[in-house]
A protein has these predicted regions:
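Phosphoinositide-binding peripheral membrane targeting modules
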Residues: 1-21
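Acidic, Ser/Thr- and proline-rich intrinsically disordered linker/docking segments
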Residues: 15-87
Length: 87
């Protein structure tokens, strides 16, 4: 199983954090995309280290604390939320 390596994700390099969910027929899968310059890294909640990734991202200045409530409801409906944008 893949694992999140926070050493490769310095907060100073993150330009944008976007959360969205994918309909997996019987469940929703919460996903996250991190923009680093011209590179996008994608993660999902089933990865080992997801909780550590979220804790890491909350240290970004102005990070949207209630992103989960906004992206998770209503169930089985496409939702996308930008939780951080570097200005």
């Amino acid at each position: 199983m893949a694992q999140v390596d926070l050493d490769l994700l310095p907060l100073t390099g993150i330009d944008k954090v976007t959360f969205y969910k994918r309909d997996e027929i019987t469940t929703d899968l919460i996903c996250c995309e991190l923009l680093f310059g011209d590179t996008t890294w994608s993660f999902h909640e089933e990865l080992v280290g997801w909780d550590s990734l979220i804790e890491h991202l909350t240290r970004l200045p102005g990070f949207l604390a209630d992103w989960f409530a906004q992206v998770s409801q209503p169930p089985f409906e496409n939702r996308e939320i930008v939780a951080f944008t570097r200005r």
